[in-house]
Amino acid sequence: MTPKVLAQLDQLDADLAQLLDRLMQEPHSVLVHKLSPERWSAYEVLQHLMLSEAGSLRYLRKKSQGLSQMKKAGFRAALRSWLVTVTLKSPLKFKTPKGTGVEVFSPVESFALLSGQWQKQREEMRQFLSELPLEIFEKEAYRHPRGGMLTIGGMLQFFKVHFERH
């Protein structure tokens, strides 16, 4: 894993730990409450973010088997990553990609269970990324549903901006 990717992962984990610490103080009734019928509860936002990261990791696991077919990342991948970042920082609303919205959310039994699942998922991602050959970090290895092919660093940047958006 490259030092830049390691720093991105460390920041993602620190941000997650801070959020989970804050939410742990809230009663269950607050975490399931929706401000309006079309808005998501805190639990639903957490599930959406987890599902998004899990789907991205599944894609990367599959695609990492074909390293020789991946294109070397260049200006276009950097531009796509920038566009994803700018778009997510804008006030525009987007439909969630299939498999990351309310249609797949499940009832949350406890905050501890949900937070434990997300932390475990992050640990698995860190382990997986640490086992990848260094050359993959220079390739267009990840396909964002709207933004197209990005590097792994671009994927982690998406995770950060997506997390901040919600």
Question: Predicted regions span which residues?
Answer:
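Short, helix-capping/interhelical loops that line the mouth of catalytic, cofactor-
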Residues: 1-7, 58-116
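An N-terminal domain-cap segment
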Residues: 1-39
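Hydrophobic alpha-helical core bundles mediating ligand binding, dimerization, or RNAP-core interactions
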Residues: 16-19, 56, 118, 122-125
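Exposed alpha-helical structural elements
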Residues: 4-7, 11, 18, 78, ...
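Short alpha-helical hairpin
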Residues: 21-31, 93-100, 135-143
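Short amphipathic alpha-helical segments with heptad-repeat character
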Residues: 6-13, 46, 50, 112-119, ...
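Short, contiguous alpha-helical
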Residues: 32-87, 123, 127-166
